[in-house]
Amino acid sequence: MSYGFGNSTGQVAGAAFSALTKIDATAIPYKSTPQALTDLAGGQITFLFVDLASSAPHVKSGRLRMLAVTSEKPSALAPGLPSVASAAQLPGFDLAAWVGVLGPAGMPVDVTNRLSVAINQMLARTEVVERFAGMGSEAAPGDAAELERTMRTQLDVWGRKVREAGITPE
């Protein structure tokens, strides 16, 4: 059995899943996710953890089938799909990628606040929410303090997952 990955999120998810399920799966690194998707569709690898947007064309064409989402709970973006936590009976398995908007250290507070207001206004627009959903993402408005808390929490979570999976720097 083998799993492919074209980015660090896929690597950590695959390694964590293999370690937690005690599946002996060989990790196959790819330069990019599209190459891994092609090999998955062609049967060269057994499974792949990948974002919804990258996999959507292959799923729509019938070449690939989605099995579960990596968020702790099922996602509205993938109706009918269970979470890995429930499908594989792995309580607490929660590896959702996220993106934040960052600025340079020392950015004036008034600039940070203006950017935050503008970003939150944009994320509240229906067409933006729909566009994010079409890319397999959910908009999560907030402020700089919330993002900082999220980043600190996620650094701990991902650091623990990397250590649990036995991934070491190359």
Placement of each model-derived feature along the sequence:
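Conserved, function-defining micro-sites of small-solute handling proteins
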Residues: 1-170
